[in-house]
């Protein structure tokens, strides 16, 4: 009976939290970044808790979205989910607001493999490999400043979002939401490969500091 009650509570809370945790929420506790992996070819999208929270192991993810901003000729292969299951669910090429850009959104489907948060550490969400001939930039959308942010000419909802609940902290259920992006030059800590339960320091990607975009050029 206790199991049934807990399951019902989880489902109902996730439904209500999904409504609350939408792209563009201005206050939150979770930060995203994108960088190259150790092979210098694959790109990874990571989440990290900010300094205000200390997540327990009893978290549950209810919603999520990651939107990449690339050149309009961008293509990729080998999308691999590492924390949660992610699928491409929208793409817009050359909108009038940013005709040189493409906006590719990846939606969260299920918390399998589970997204495991740890204080001051990165968790890898998914990876992908850009086409060999692509030499443009790849960055995460800035929800509040991008020219294609909602409302836009396509009536779409690009943006970054992650909504989680923590059942294991004192004081009752805690809610964590996406806050902003962070970039290289910060102390990112070790990465957590959620599906493999291993920790490995990630190499530094080359970023355009003023834009937070990852370059495909190899480090010199």
PLM segments and residue spans:
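Bacterial N-terminal signal peptides that target proteins for export
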Residues: 1-8
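Boundary/junction segments of secreted and surface-exposed precursor proteins
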Residues: 21-42, 177, 183-220
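Low-complexity, serine/threonine/proline/glycine-rich extracellular segments that form mucin-like
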Residues: 26-31, 35-91
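A structural detector for beta-sheet-dominated domains
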Residues: 33-37, 46-48, 69-71, 107-109, ...
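Structured beta-strand segments within beta-sheet-rich domains
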Residues: 46-47, 89-137
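The transition from N-terminal targeting/processing segments to the mature protein
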Residues: 47, 57-59, 79-99, 117, ...
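Ser/Thr/Pro-rich, low-complexity mucin-like regions
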Residues: 117-173
């Amino acid at each position: 009976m206790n199991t049934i009650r807990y399951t019902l509570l989880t489902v109902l809370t996730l439904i209500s939290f999904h409504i609350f945790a939408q792209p563009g929420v201005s206050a939150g506790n979770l930060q995203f970044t994108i960088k190259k992996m150790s092979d210098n070819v694959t790109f990874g999208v990571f989440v990290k808790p900010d300094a205000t929270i200390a997540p327990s192991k009893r978290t549950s993810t209810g919603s999520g979205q990651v939107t990449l901003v690339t050149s309009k000729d961008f293509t990729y292969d080998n999308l691999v989910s590492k924390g949660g299951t992610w699928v491409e669910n929208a793409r817009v090429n050359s909108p009038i607001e940013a005709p040189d850009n493409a906006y590719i959104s990846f939606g969260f489907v299920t918390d399998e493999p589970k997204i495991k948060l740890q204080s001051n550490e990165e968790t890898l969400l998914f990876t992908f490999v850009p086409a060999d001939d692509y030499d443009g930039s790849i960055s995460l959308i800035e929800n509040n400043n991008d020219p294609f942010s909602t409302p836009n000419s396509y009536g779409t909802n690009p943006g970054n979002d992650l909504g989680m609940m923590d059942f294991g902290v004192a004081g009752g259920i805690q809610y964590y939401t996406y806050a902003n992006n962070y970039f290289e030059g910060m102390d990112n800590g070790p990465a957590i490969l959620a599906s493999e339960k291993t920790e490995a320091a990630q190499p530094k990607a080359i970023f355009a500091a003023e834009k937070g975009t990852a370059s495909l050029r190899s480090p010199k």
